[in-house]
Amino acid sequence: MPDLDRIVKDIAEEMRARPDRGAVASYIPELARADPQAFGLVVIDGDGRVAAGGDADIAFSIQSISKVFTLTLALGMVGDRLWRRVGREPSGSPFNSIVQLERENGIPRNPFINAGAIAVTDVILSGHQPREALGEILRFMQFLAQDDSIAIDDRVAASEKRTGFRNAALANYMRSFDVIENPVDYTLGVYFHHCAIAMTCRQLATAGLFLAYSGHHPLAGHSVISAERARRINAIMLTCGHYDGSGDFAYRVGLPGKSGVGGGILAVAPGRASICVWSPGLDAAGNSHLGRIALEMLVKRTGWSIFGV
């Protein structure tokens, strides 16, 4: 990766010096403990070459980034039948909004807003006990990251459960339309726990490689999903991956990506690399403030936007 090491390290240094860092998520108490000065960036290509800068090996709560992987699992289980229970359109609303559910008969707008991810989690749960479903999700993450040490932060999961009243409202509302088929408490329990998986930038970038290489994970040595499915997941990441900031992210960065309120962003440069950036301070839409700026810098300096140089 010519010059990429220098590019990544330069960006990390520039981000360290910026005073405008956004606000750390406070509605989940455990997330409020994150260090607002933290910043990490990792880029991994298909040969396993790594460019890393900043806090690349500090674990953080991946939160909604897990939704990329639960979507992948659910599609593997039920295929396109999933789209009977969740849509594929941008929401234009906050990630935990209930307004669209009321207007659209309990069908979530896409799998990356909270309601959609809860519905996807319910698909994975069907036919399993909650512990089994959660174990399947965790093992999938460990496999993709090529690291069996990845675990759930139980303190974050418990914190989410204690304060997850809006998510409970979303799940119960969907249950009234039979979009949720399992006991709501079971589905929410699995959802809270997979959002509480803790990973580093290096681990997440490794996990996302299959999306950068047409469904093939070059480090694992075989295909995870078909090229067509990888392309479609990337499309949903581009249009829906940053809640009501998705259009701005596509405009500024031009890569498929998925954010989480833990401050992480997983981004995909198709055919080139998988990227993870982490900075806990968020913008008004709940996306990493410096993370988006760093990715915009990276794309400008590498020419990796899917829309051209």
Swiss-Prot record:
Superkingdom of origin organism: Bacteria
Annotated EC: 3.5.1.2
Sorted UniProt keywords: Hydrolase
Pfam families: Glutaminase
GO MF term list: glutaminase activity
SUPFAM superfamilies for this protein: beta-lactamase/transpeptidase-like (SSF56601)
Catalytic activity as recorded in UniProt: L-glutamine + H2O = L-glutamate + NH4(+)
InterPro entries reported in the protein's UniProt record: Beta-lactam/transpept-like, Glutaminase
Positions annotated to bind substrate: S64, N114, E160, N167, Y191, Y243, V261
Description of how the protein assembles with itself and partners: Homotetramer.
Protein name listed in UniProt: Glutaminase
Annotated organism of origin: Methylorubrum populi (strain ATCC BAA-705 / NCIMB 13946 / BJ001)
Annotated gene: glsA
